[in-house]
Amino acid sequence: NAISYEIMLKDEGRPAAGRRDGYFSIYRQGGTTTDEGERIDYRVKMYNPETGGQIDVRNNENMVWNSINLKRVRPVVLPGIRYAVMCVPTPLTLAVDKFSVMDKQAGYYMGKLSVIFTPSLPTIN
């Protein structure tokens, strides 16, 4: 079991002038800019296993959780692993603030949200 967990969520990292601090973005396919008219900004909330409440996640910022392996742990079967792995459920909620569709270019919007999870492991002397 890990002593602590470092978690970071980030989007593609493209520049996004006018985007609220901490928000994430998806972009219009075939778009030539990252202007507000060719992207849709969103925010992410995450279940905090330390408190049991929801927290706002900020784009590209590390969060460190300690001793969560002592709370709400349950076995989960993951693809490619023959045995159940002990996990703490941490659902994500993605939310888009209201906007006028007239302010956006027509087309398909897509993006990538990466979740980087780094457990620290105890050392054996």
Model feature map: region roles:
Residues 1-45, 95-96, 100-108, 112, ...:
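N-terminal small/polar-rich segments of proteins
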